[in-house]
Amino acid sequence: MASSDFNPDAPLHIRALNHTTIPVKDRYKAALFYVAVLGGEMHHESAPDRVKKGLARSLQVGVRLCAGLEIDLFEQNYGQPAWDQSHPHHALDVPTEELEKWAAHLKKWKVPFVGPMTRAGTGSAEMYFNDPDGNHLELHCSNYPGHEKLPAGPYDKRLTVHKQPWPPLELEAEANRLLQASLERMRRLKKSA
């Protein structure tokens, strides 16, 4: 990171966001979504006996979405945002040339979404959707060509609510296959380390 990336007057510096946590009702069911739909890779999982012994606070799995971004999916029965809230949400930066492909990909996986749309004057394009636990997500493209032709927000949040259980029955086997392959790679790496 270049020194110009930091506030020169700050006595200490933060290099990057290491990870973020998201509350979910079932860590492996949530991981299905983050691996199958968002292309994440399983990074770690907590052992239930560590929670029982008080060595870990809750059951969780970690999914790495890209270099430098890990999402820890913590099991808890509260904390998911209401469907009609905009915040908090997690914005994921995607390549401009892939935004339309993301729309097709979300449709394939039966994920309700809104967009692409823009926020007036930003030059960006966004798509909004929820994970199956109701956590709000955004796919974001800065400097999107043709942004001025896109509808401007705010969007109708009702359009991002999952009306059916996810994954849909016809996609469940594929989602499970992707998750199992990712879990096997993670466990192999842990054994070889």
Regions found by a protein language model. Give the residues of each.
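Generic structural signal for well-ordered beta-strand positions
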Residues: 43, 137-138
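Short, flexible turn/loop "capping" segments at secondary-structure junctions
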Residues: 10-14, 81-84
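Core segments of cupin and vicinal oxygen chelate
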Residues: 22-70
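A short beta-turn/loop motif at secondary-structure boundaries
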Residues: 51-55, 80, 118-122
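Conserved beta-strand in the GNAT
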Residues: 71-74, 138
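Vicinal oxygen chelate
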Residues: 2, 15, 24-28, 85, ...
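A detector for short, charged/polar N-terminal pre-domain segments
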Residues: 2-12
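Histidine-centered active-site/metal-ligand motif
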Residues: 19, 60, 89, 140
